[in-house]
C-alpha cells in the first residue's frame, strides 16, 4: 500500500498563510476563513509501540505515518472576523487519546480507539476489530455517543477527502439528492 498522508499534509500546509489561515470556497458559494494548526511534536517509534502494547493493537501504517509527522492537529477551525470560534477536525495526540479513553462510559460497547473529534459531536474512531481482521476500511464515526457508523475508509483517504471537501462531511453527501437537498436547508 502506498502512503500519501505526508503529501496531503504538506499540500495543505503550502496553502496556509503565515498565521496558519486559509480562505476556502464552501458550499452554496460561501467563502470562509479557517485556521489549520499541526502539532510540532512527533510521536516516536517508542511512543507508538508503548501505546500499541497498552491497548493490544497495531496502529495502521498510514495513521502511524501521520503521528510521526505531527502528533495531533486542528484542521479547519472557523475564523470569524479573525477570531477562532472552533469547529473543524481535531486529530488527537497519543496523549489526548489516552485522556479520551478515560471516559469509559462514552465508549462502552465500542471496540475502538478515538483518534479525533469533529462536527462538534462526533468522534473519529479506529475500529479494533477491523484492524485485527486486516480490513483496511477501519475508520468509523461515533456520533453523539449513540451511532457507530462505518466510513469504509482508512485514515489517509479520510484525511485527503476531508481536506478536499474543505471540512464538509463528505460521507453524508450521498444522502442529499435533488429531491431532498432543499428540505434540509
Curated annotation (Swiss-Prot):
What the entry lists under Pfam families is as follows: SMI1_KNR4 (PF09346)
InterPro entries membership: Knr4/Smi1-like_dom, Knr4/Smi1-like_sf
Name under which the protein is recorded = SPbeta prophage-derived uncharacterized protein YokH
Please give the organism: Bacillus subtilis (strain 168)
Amino acid at each position: 500500500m502506498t502512503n500519501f498522508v505526508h503529501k496531503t499534509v504538506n499540500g495543505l500546509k503550502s496553502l496556509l498563510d503565515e498565521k496558519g489561515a486559509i480562505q476556502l470556497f464552501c458550499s452554496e458559494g460561501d467563502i470562509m476563513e479557517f485556521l489549520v494548526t499541526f502539532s510540532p511534536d512527533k510521536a516516536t517509534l517508542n511512543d507508538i509501540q508503548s501505546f500499541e502494547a497498552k491497548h493490544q493493537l497495531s496502529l495502521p501504517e498510514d495513521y502511524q505515518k501521520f503521528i510521526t509527522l505531527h502528533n495531533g492537529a486542528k484542521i479547519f477551525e472557523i475564523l470569524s472576523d479573525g477570531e477562532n470560534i472552533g469547529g473543524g477536525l481535531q486529530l488527537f495526540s497519543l496523549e489526548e487519546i489516552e485522556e479520551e479513553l478515560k471516559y469509559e462510559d462514552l465508549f462502552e460497547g465500542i471496540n475502538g480507539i478515538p483518534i479525533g473529534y469533529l462536527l462538534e459531536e462526533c468522534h473519529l474512531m479506529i475500529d479494533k476489530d477491523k484492524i485485527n481482521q486486516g480490513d483496511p476500511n477501519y475508520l468509523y464515526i461515533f456520533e453523539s455517543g449513540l451511532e457507530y457508523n462505518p466510513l469504509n475508509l482508512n485514515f489517509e483517504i479520510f484525511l485527503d477527502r476531508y481536506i478536499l471537501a474543505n471540512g464538509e462531511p463528505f460521507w453524508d453527501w450521498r444522502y442529499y439528492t435533488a429531491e431532498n437537498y432543499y428540505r434540509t436547508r
